[in-house]
A protein has these predicted regions:
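Glycine-rich phosphate-binding loop plus the immediately following alpha-helix
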Residues: 105, 112-124, 146-189, 251-255
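Glycine-rich phosphate-binding loops at beta-strand->alpha-helix junctions
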Residues: 13, 59-66, 191, 210-227
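Gly/Thr-rich phosphate-binding beta-strand-loop-beta motif of the actin/hexokinase/Hsp70
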Residues: 1-26, 116, 120-145, 161, ...
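Short hydrophobic/aromatic-enriched beta-strand-loop microsegments
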Residues: 78-85, 145-151, 232-243
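Active-site neighborhood for divalent-cation/phosphate handling
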Residues: 82-127, 133-134
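Adenine-nucleotide phosphate-binding core of ATP-dependent small-molecule kinases
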Residues: 30, 177-213, 237
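Glycine-rich phosphate-binding/hydrolytic loop that grips phosphoryl groups
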Residues: 236-259
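N-terminal glycine/serine-rich phosphate-binding loop of ATP-dependent small-molecule kinases
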Residues: 1-92
Length: 259
């Protein structure tokens, strides 16, 4: 077994998984908010035991300060590990990057697209990663990243309309959806924001002629019930946790361990 540490440093949380380069499952996983990033060292120490990984593949969209902090923690808990900071390129793990400037594509979007391709090989797919921002990207059946769209995430969209954070509408995953014509302001904000998110995903799915829609991200459990009502997506919707991490793992699986 060759263990790798995968790290996904997003805008809100840092997620990680310890994986075997030759296996599908994860050996361990965890996460921490940026404010609690110091907890990662303890999580990693527990997961690694006496055998820290020799290789790390990390995607970071949270800036250079977060990268520096992660490098310091990795040096302490996995000294000598070879660390690759994942960046978008013209092609990787069987996915061709169709961006006009491939290096300009966010590494999280490229990783998510690689993950979607690995989960739905040979199929036209749309992957929606619903976090601080919602990204909706298209991959064709031949394995080419076609492009995509970026819009404010569900929370950001709602907070821009609410008067203050204490008045943000609250919803539990799987709860009843608000009426599309709400009779109170909180539900009206929520209905509008959910409709905007779901509508953008449905439109992308239709325009791409996709046969599968992969939904991921922290807001996915809130958006999924509305998408489940869309006849266009019947039988095509799949909720997948940690799609960026799935993409990083797909890279490790595809490329194996370096000699």
């Amino acid at each position: 077994m060759s263990a790798w540490l995968l790290v996904d440093a997003g805008n809100t949380r840092i997620k990680w998984a310890l994986v075997d380069s030759a296996a599908d499952g994860w050996l361990a996983e965890g996460a921490a908010l940026h404010a609690d990033a110091a907890d990662l060292a303890a999580q990693w120490g527990t997961a690694f035991g006496a055998a820290p990984p020799l290789r790390v593949l990390a995607a970071n969209v949270a800036g250079t300060a977060v990268r520096t902090r992660l490098e310091q923690m990795l040096a302490a808990v996995a000294p000598g590990a070879a660390v690759e900071w994942f960046a978008s390129s013209a092609q990787r793990a069987g996915l061709v990057n169709g961006y006009r400037n491939p290096a300009q594509l966010g590494c999280d979007r490229f990783a998510a697209a690689i993950g979607a391709r690995a989960l739905a090989p040979g199929r036209a797919v749309v992957v929606a990663n619903c976090g601080t921002a919602t990204t909706i990207d298209a991959i064709d059946a031949a394995g080419r990243f076609v492009g995509g769209m970026i819009l404010p995430g569900l929370g950001l969209m709602a907070s821009s309309l609410a008067r203050n954070t204490a008045q943000l509408p609250q919803i539990q995953p799987g709860a009843l959806l608000p009426s599309p014509f709400a009779d109170n302001t909180d539900d009206a904000i929520l209905a509008g924001c959910l409709s905007a998110q779901a509508g953008a995903i449905e439109r992308a799915f239709a325009r791409h002629g996709a046969v599968e829609c992969i939904l991921s991200g922290g807001a996915a459990p809130y958006i999924a019930p509305m998408l489940a009502q869309a006849p266009l997506l019947a039988g095509a919707l799949r909720h997948v946790d940690n799609i960026v991490m799935k993409g990083l793992h797909a890279i490790v699986r595809a490329e194996g361990d370096p000699c």
